[in-house]
């Protein structure tokens, strides 16, 4: 008995859940298990949430040019630049506070910020494709847990590999 494309489409959510959430988030744990991982693991959240917060603030104040009007109409180019610069500065401050390498942390946070924006836009594309605004309703005004962690999910593997390459 052959299986049609319908079977493939029925299995996509399970595959998505395993790879997108399970495998990629496992890099948070893997980063924590590196030498010095108790400091490096925070870079994941510093990059993604720091970039998001700085991008929002700069975008609200100075945003004029839409970055991805179809996927995420409120995001601006100015906000994106502010997010990356903000994440780099947060990385430098974190390096000073933890006696880490400033250049290494700045590079990690800059690249991590870019990837976190890609993750956020990818999540927006998935939601638009499925015709939904948020992944859930757990956090009023913010959607579900996955909405808060979409950029973290993309950032975690990159921070892990950059930590291995630049710090270890």
Predicted stretch roles:
Residues 16-54, 59-65, 69, 77-168:
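Hydrophobic alpha-helical transmembrane segments
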Residues 10-16:
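Interfacial transmembrane-helix boundary/kink motif in multi-pass membrane proteins
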Residues 1-9:
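Single conserved hydrophobic/aromatic residue that forms the stacking wall/gate
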């Amino acid at each position: 008995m052959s299986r049609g494309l319908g079977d493939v489409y029925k299995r996509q959510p399970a595959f998505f859940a395993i790879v997108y959430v399970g495998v990629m988030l496992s890099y948070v744990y893997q980063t924590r298990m590196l030498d010095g991982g108790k400091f490096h693991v925070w870079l994941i959240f510093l990059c993604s949430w720091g970039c998001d917060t700085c991008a929002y603030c700069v975008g609200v104040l100075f945003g004029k040019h839409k970055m991805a009007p179809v996927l995420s109409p409120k995001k601006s180019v100015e906000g994106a630049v502010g997010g990356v610069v903000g994440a780099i500065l947060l990385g430098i401050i974190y390096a000073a506070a933890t006696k880490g390498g400033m250049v290494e942390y700045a590079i990690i946070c800059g690249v991590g910020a870019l990837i976190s924006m890609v993750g956020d836009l990818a999540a927006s594309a998935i939601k638009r494709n499925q015709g939904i605004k948020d992944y859930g309703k757990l956090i009023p005004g913010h959607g579900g847990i996955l909405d808060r962690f979409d950029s973290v999910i993309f950032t975690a593997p990159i921070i892990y590999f950059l930590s291995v390459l630049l710090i270890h």
